[in-house]
């Protein structure tokens, strides 16, 4: 999601998103170095008049332009593979949240607790308070505790959706008849916004996601109050 006067990724709210940002910066530096090097060589070749009519085969230079790109790809691939395995690793989740995509809203079930399930609809612009975000706020937010491992089970009832929270580095497809899962760890309190990231029909743009991260003590109080 773009924000006003900002060309960077959103501020991280989870360790995995921090790793994604580090990898993005790492890859971008390598791409900038390659662009500068290739541009410098092309400009030099364009403006000089050196010609070698007898240079037909050069095993050394062929070896160099084969080995150097291979080493560069290794420097990109190794951190990428490490990050891919980290994103799929699941360590003893404290809470499991089931997310169900519908046309065009989300419903949530806290599977570890009784009688905690609700639908989450976007708040219409004419009903939106002045301090809320247009097309991003919902009537029922997801309440989750920070500094705890959270597991998300994602599915859909009609068409393919995608449950996405950029600041947590989470994007999971919601497929009818299939249960996908992911996990994340929220390391600070706050409100984090996301949207459906798979075109799913006429009102695809009106499927926001809002997570409110609170302390474990406040979360237990919320659970107790909601149960009654």
Curated annotation (Swiss-Prot):
Binding site for Mg(2+): 198
Gene Ontology MF term list: copper ion binding; cytochrome-c oxidase activity
Pfam families given in the database record: COX2 (PF00116), COX2_TM (PF02790)
Co-factor binding details: Binds a dinuclear copper A center per subunit.
Residue ranges that the UniProt entry lists as topological domain Mitochondrial intermembrane: 1-26, 83-228
Cofactor list: Cu cation
Substrates-to-products reaction catalysed: 4 Fe(II)-[cytochrome c] + O2 + 8 H(+)(in) = 4 Fe(III)-[cytochrome c] + 2 H2O + 4 H(+)(out)
Membrane topology: Multi-pass membrane protein
Binding locations of Cu cation A1: 161, 196, 200, 207
Subcellular location: Mitochondrion inner membrane
Enzyme class: translocase
GO cellular component: mitochondrial inner membrane
InterPro entries for this protein: CcO_II, CcO_II-like_C, CcO_II_C, Copper_CuA, Cupredoxin, Cyt_c_oxidase_su2_TM_dom, Cyt_c_oxidase_su2_TM_sf
Family matches, as CDD domains: CcO_II_C (cd13912)
Gene3D superfamilies documented for this protein: 1.10.287.90, Cupredoxins - blue copper proteins
GO biological process, any: ATP synthesis coupled electron transport
Segments crossing the lipid bilayer: 27-48, 63-82
Residue spans, topological domain Mitochondrial matrix: 49-62
Keywords annotated in UniProt: Copper, Electron transport, Magnesium, Membrane, Metal-binding, Mitochondrion, Mitochondrion inner membrane, Respiratory chain, Translocase, Transmembrane, Transmembrane helix, Transport
Similarity section: Belongs to the cytochrome c oxidase subunit 2 family.
Subunit structure, as described in the record: Component of the cytochrome c oxidase (complex IV, CIV), a multisubunit enzyme composed of a catalytic core of 3 subunits and several supernumerary subunits. The complex exists as a monomer or a dimer and forms supercomplexes (SCs) in the inner mitochondrial membrane with ubiquinol-cytochrome c oxidoreductase (cytochrome b-c1 complex, complex III, CIII).
Known role: Component of the cytochrome c oxidase, the last enzyme in the mitochondrial electron transport chain which drives oxidative phosphorylation. The respiratory chain contains 3 multisubunit complexes succinate dehydrogenase (complex II, CII), ubiquinol-cytochrome c oxidoreductase (cytochrome b-c1 complex, complex III, CIII) and cytochrome c oxidase (complex IV, CIV), that cooperate to transfer electrons derived from NADH and succinate to molecular oxygen, creating an electrochemical gradient over the inner membrane that drives transmembrane transport and the ATP synthase.
Protein's recorded name: Cytochrome c oxidase subunit 2
Organism: Galleria mellonella (Greater wax moth)
